[in-house]
Amino acid sequence: MGDEDVDGKCKNMSACSSTTSYSTKLFLFMVPLVVISGFVFVNIGPKDSTSLLTSLSTTTSHLPPPFLSTAPAPAPSPLLPEILPSLPASSLSTKVESIQGDYNRTIQLNMINVTATSNNVSSTASLEPKKRRVLSNLEKIEFKLQKARASIKAASMDDPVDDPDYVPLGPMYWNAKVFHRSYLEMEKQFKIYVYKEGEPPLFHDGPCKSIYSMEGSFIYEIETDTRFRTNNPDKAHVFYLPFSVVKMVRYVYERNSRDFSPIRNTVKDYINLVGDKYPYWNRSIGADHFILSCHDWGPEASFSHPHLGHNSIRALCNANTSERFKPRKDVSIPEINLRTGSLTGLVGGPSPSSRPILAFFAGGVHGPVRPVLLQHWENKDNDIRVHKYLPRGTSYSDMMRNSKFCICPSGYEVASPRIVEALYSGCVPVLINSGYVPPFSDVLNWRSFSVIVSVEDIPNLKTILTSISPRQYLRMYRRVLKVRRHFEVNSPAKRFDVFHMILHSIWVRRLNVKIREV
């Protein structure tokens, strides 16, 4: 009504400009109406606009993040639904949706500005278009990550993508199409900055021919890599702290001293060094930084600095939830014993029909699980071959190749190189442990190609294994042959091998975090 009065006033004033007294009266009559109409516009207009903006944001917030499952537990829709099973819905959804919400708010605010100025022609002519704010490097990174999330989320509804090397298919994957899309997005944009500070042997070095070979293998591959490594930290998604706990135990720790402080101080000093020299650690409080360790003391070393243990991505062989391993942010990596530094002679084995032994294990009495296994099965059954020491002249690798199932109990720590050795040999792994998160569980459905047995069920081991039908065993065997490519060490690295699977797990953890400017 106020707008109609204003238009009427303009017409009357142009028609009767010669009558001064009448114009004066009309002016005095119209001023209050103009004031009232302006008051109404100011109070109603913004309130309606805000309501529209709030409605849009609310709608956006209902979209589930790409890596959070909405399916019931018995039928997960993983990569990334089952990927972080312990992640609270609120923490992940807030981080992911805030990105989409910020982007939608920018669009909506621009629409409101255009609508408001179009209602007033005279003021529109005097307004200059607003300059777009230049995004920072971090904001550009986060915007591209948001697009990657959307692409990955949509993958489950799309057709499989052709790939010249390998197309993930089958029940070995929680969601093969989502994993493949995520892997391709990683190849497209993932960048890692390796801090150059530090000298060998404690930094930029690691063992390549031992049970801890993943430390040295990863350091070598990432430092010689040209696809994922960047020399520009402003373009990096994550930052690698390239120290080796194995080397610290060898060169810093005083044997039998039980004094962990030299290792703790080395880690703490290194983080303080890069934190003082660069802005990136303090910007995220370590959330976009990662370490990799296969030593039993890796988890303990990570808590040398509180933010490293609590915030950073920790790629660990010793992935034990009872020792503060957190699947929502940490990465379980395989323990691989490369005695010669290569896979020569390690991969391969006969067909199922040429495997006469039902199950096999040989190993020392380490930790709480193995004594129970040996107590019930050592030298007591021809089908379940359990030995503390192998008989003279018997080959360990030949026993694995001649067995249908390979028993992989935890020792002092939950991880065991036997798991990968079983996969290499074409032997279905039997995992017996407590609190262990198997490698790449964010992507791989271990129950489809391995047998998981609780410590309490060790006495029933033969019953459990013989209850698996020949047809089901054959399916598991074939899946082992397919999935073992993800555990193979290659130099140079090959797509979908263990190096790239570790990178993918780190990539997924980075996708689940949003870093903001400080």
Curated annotation (Swiss-Prot):
The keyword Oxidoreductase does not apply. Residues 47-518 are lumenal. Disulfide bonds: none annotated. It holds the Pfam family Exostosin_GT47. SUPFAM superfamilies: UDP-Glycosyltransferase/glycogen phosphorylase. It is found in: Golgi apparatus membrane. The chain crosses the membrane at residues 26-46. InterPro entries: Exostosin, Exostosin_GT47. It is a single-pass type II membrane protein. Glycans are attached at residues 104, 113, 120, 282, 320. The keyword Cell wall biogenesis/degradation applies. Its EC number is 2.4.-.-. GO terms for molecular function: glycosyltransferase activity. Gene3D superfamilies: Glycogen Phosphorylase B. GO terms for biological process: cell wall organization; protein glycosylation. Keywords: Cell wall biogenesis/degradation, Glycoprotein, Glycosyltransferase, Golgi apparatus, Membrane, Signal-anchor, Transferase, Transmembrane, Transmembrane helix. GO terms for cellular component: Golgi membrane. Belongs to the glycosyltransferase 47 family. PANTHER family: EXOSTOSIN HEPARAN SULFATE GLYCOSYLTRANSFERASE -RELATED (PTHR11062), OS07G0188700 PROTEIN (PTHR11062:SF207). May be involved in cell wall biosynthesis. This is Probable glycosyltransferase At5g03795. It comes from Arabidopsis thaliana.
